[in-house]
Curated annotation (Swiss-Prot):
Family: Belongs to the cytochrome b family.
Main location: mitochondrion
Single Gene Ontology MF annotation: ubiquinol-cytochrome-c reductase activity
CDD domains per record: cytochrome_b_C (cd00290), Cytochrome_b_N (cd00284)
Origin species: Xerus rutilus
Chain ranges passing through the membrane: 33-53, 77-98, 113-133, 178-198, 226-246, 288-308, 320-340, 347-367
Cofactor binding summary note: Binds 2 heme b groups non-covalently.
Topological relation to the membrane, as annotated: Multi-pass membrane protein
Miscellaneous section: Heme 1 (or BL or b562) is low-potential and absorbs at about 562 nm, and heme 2 (or BH or b566) is high-potential and absorbs at about 566 nm.
Protein name: Cytochrome b
Length: 379
């Protein structure tokens, strides 16, 4: 009699994905973030579901309903802060996951990589709409500023913005539709994540050396299931420390003031995980140019497979490319810092230089360095 795990039509799929999956024997803790992202998504969907039971998407009561959740609902404060900080944890894992893909050359799996970039866009859209829902000052003005960027699109821009707003400004219609989209998008993300996994399991995982590992593979369970659980506990420790000790650390104090269309906050800025893109947007004085740079800063990830000029897949044995990669990481930290600063000297010029460096490293320096390394290795 065959094992149910291997013969049952439904359990068989789970078995091939998480139990008997042949996995390279040398993948490091950097390969943990895929499963952690899955857990983050589940946490966000569950906490979001319970928040949606008490939240009202009306401009007059949205802010009060969030206060009601925190004060009157059983453990409402915990659910709310887990959801808010869960987004931050989600993005930390996302950035590390993408960074690992860039470092170890995982982008050579075209379909997996491009669906990953699409997932990044979808998660960013979901997080942006979620930030609008508490209807605080930064929610309202963030929504106004970011949606207004679409007016830079020639000819159709103004009509498009008013269509998204559902009126002539960010108002009740905008909040209602943002809530609807914020509710549905995580399920679309879950579906995309399954497609992401489907394509990954067609080729098998990459590994730190970047070499083909078919001759040396081990089953995912128990080896990597245990390893992933360790990563999960470390993530939960950091996450719950943040939620229980300083839940407002990553938030904006302005969002504790109810939205007021007549009073503009001194510095309008998005959540920390968008600051790098926001800095790139602000570094260009022209509105349309800024919007194009903003979109390009993420879309440029789809260029990685095309720009790969090295004879080696991974950066593990390429010290010059490694140096450039870490300069790029430092540059992203700089952009994140600049995005949170006011638009004044010297922050403007630092932001412009950091933006130029970001695109130069990816489009020019990394491919040229890889070619030089090929020459140094006499390939």
């Amino acid at each position: 009699m065959t094992n149910t795990r291997k013969s049952h039509p439904l359990i068989k799929i789970i078995n091939h994905s998480f139990i008997d999956l042949p996995t390279p024997s040398n993948i490091s803790a950097w390969w943990n973030f895929g499963s952690l992202l899955g857990i983050c998504l589940v946490v966000q969907i569950l906490t979001g579901l319970f928040l949606a039971m008490h939240y009202t998407s009306d401009t007059t009561t949205a802010f009060s309903s969030v206060a009601h959740i925190c004060r009157d609902v059983n453990y409402g404060w915990l659910i709310r802060y887990m959801h808010a900080n869960g987004a931050s944890m989600f993005f930390i894992c996302l950035f590390l996951h993408v960074g690992r893909g860039m470092y170890y050359g995982s982008y050579t799996f075209f379909e997996t990589w491009n669906i990953g970039v699409l997932l990044l866009f979808t998660v960013m859209a979901t997080a942006f709409m979620g930030y609008v829902l508490p209807w605080g000052q930064m929610s309202f003005w963030g929504a106004t500023v970011i949606t207004n960027l679409l007016s830079a699109i020639p000819y159709a821009g103004t009509n498009l913005v008013e269509w998204i707003w559902g009126g002539f400004s960010v108002d009740k219609a905008t909040l209602t539709r943002f809530f609807a989209f914020h509710f549905i998008l995580p399920f679309i993300i879950a579906a995309l994540a399954m497609v992401h996994l489907l394509f990954l399991h067609e080729t098998g995982s990459n590994n730190p050396s970047g070499l083909i590992s078919d001759s040396d593979k081990i089953p995912f369970h128990p080896y990597y299931s245990i390893k992933d659980i360790l990563g999960l506990f470390i993530l939960l420790l950091a996450f719950m420390t943040l939620v229980l000790f300083s839940p407002d650390l990553l938030g904006d104090p302005d969002n504790y003031t109810p939205a007021n269309p007549l009073s503009t906050p001194p510095h309008i800025k998005p959540e920390w995980y968008f600051l790098f893109a926001y800095a790139i947007l602000r570094s260009i004085p022209n509105k349309l140019g800024g919007v194009l740079a903003l979109i390009s800063s993420i879309l440029i990830l789809t260029m990685f497979p095309i720009l790969h000029t090295s004879k080696q897949r991974s950066m593990m044995f390429r010290p010059l490319s490694q140096c450039l990669f870490w300069v790029l990481v430092a540059d992203l930290f700089t952009l994140t810092w600049i995005g949170g600063q006011p638009v004044e000297h010297p922050f403007i010029i630092i932001g412009q230089l950091a933006s130029i460096l970001y695109f130069t490293i990816i489009l020019l320096l990394l491919p040229l360095t890889a070619l030089m390394e090929n020459k140094l290795l006499k390939w």
